[in-house]
């Protein structure tokens, strides 16, 4: 085992990386509230894992979406548990995200030189809310359908481009299969990818600049 480790150590300098991670200075004013961002990240990982598991059985069509969700809940082994964890973790992620934003704002963590860290955080907050909006529609039940109809109809109030935005979101004039396909693609591919990219940027900047000092 030692020879294997030495082989990797010689090429990748694993010990230096481990020492850098474990020896990072933590300011004395840091308390439990500074862990909320990490909890949000953990919820995101749970969402990815449980969401990926459900993609094996979910069918993103207006004719089969609701039935496929019922199948996950009643026939798939532990399907009810996986979907329930996905739903609970989603609520927890939104709550932790809001608390994290408040903590950073109230402790002045958005000030110079951490403006870009704040910007990436705000973008991830928008992505988190978008996860909720797009995921809410996927069962394609009465609640999901009318929620989509209302949400996608909001931009219609924007002068000039409102109608175009509505048709872009819905994939047509009305809510239908094209809308569900768009929301499914956003929920399972576009938003996770965007969130992962900005999350990496967020972490790298925190790693570079460190945790902000006390007020």
Swiss-Prot record:
Location in or out of the cell: Plastid, Chloroplast thylakoid membrane
Binding site for heme b 2: 83, 86, 187
Cellular component GO terms, alphabetical: chloroplast thylakoid membrane; membrane
Gene: petB
HAMAP family, sorted: Cytb6_f_cytb6
Cofactor note: Binds 2 heme b groups non-covalently with two histidine residues as axial ligands.
GO process terms (BP): photosynthesis; respiratory electron transport chain
Cofactor(s) required, per the database record: heme b; heme c
Keyword Transport: yes
Residues holding heme c: 35, 207, 211
Family the entry assigns: Belongs to the cytochrome b family. PetB subfamily.
Protein's UniProt name: Cytochrome b6
Additional information: Creation by mutagenesis of a Pro residue at position 204 (a codon that is known to be RNA edited to a Leu codon in tobacco and maize) leads to assembly defective mutants, indicating that the Leu-204 is essential for proper assembly of the cytochrome b6-f complex. This is probably due to lack of assembly of apocytochrome b6 with one of its heme groups.
Task of the protein: Component of the cytochrome b6-f complex, which mediates electron transfer between photosystem II (PSII) and photosystem I (PSI), cyclic electron flow around PSI, and state transitions.
Sequence positions that bind heme b 1: 37, 100, 103, 114, 202, 212
One Pfam family linked to the record: Cytochrome_B
